[in-house]
From Swiss-Prot:
Organism annotation: Conus pulicarius (Flea-bitten cone)
Bridged cysteine pairs (disulfide): C44-C50, C45-C58
GO cellular component: extracellular region; host cell postsynaptic membrane
Tissues with expression: Expressed by the venom duct.
Lineage, broadest ranks: Eukaryota, Metazoa, Spiralia, Lophotrochozoa, Mollusca
Name listed for the protein in its UniProt record: Alpha-conotoxin-like Pu1.4
Pfam families: Toxin_8 (PF07365)
Top-level taxon of origin: Eukaryota
Key words, A-Z: Acetylcholine receptor inhibiting toxin, Disulfide bond, Ion channel impairing toxin, Neurotoxin, Postsynaptic neurotoxin, Secreted, Signal, Toxin
Signal sequence range: 1-16
């Protein structure tokens, strides 16, 4: 009985591991991993549907850009004193 149990465990273990020999499945798996690289965060902020997912990042970027723009408008003087 114990031998039958070991055979069942061995059979289910072998069946549960995916085969790496099928190049078609490897190609499909590699395509799925590149899906997140379609949009950069900056491009995502420009798309309304994507912007909602990373709104905090977009708002922080806009606040930084506005602060940088305001800083660039300040008169710049070198003070020797």
């Amino acid at each position: 009985m114990f031998t039958v149990f070991l055979l069942v465990v061995l059979a289910t273990t072998v069946v549960s591991f995916p085969s790496d020999r099928d190049p078609a499945s490897n190609h499909e798996n590699s395509k799925g991993s590149n899906r997140n690289a379609w949009f950069t965060p900056e491009e995502c902020c420009a798309a309304p549907a994507c912007r909602g997912m990373i709104l905090e990042f977009c708002l922080a970027g806009e606040a930084f850009a506005a602060a940088l723009d305001g800083f660039r408008r300040l008169p710049y003087r070198l003070s020797s004193e």
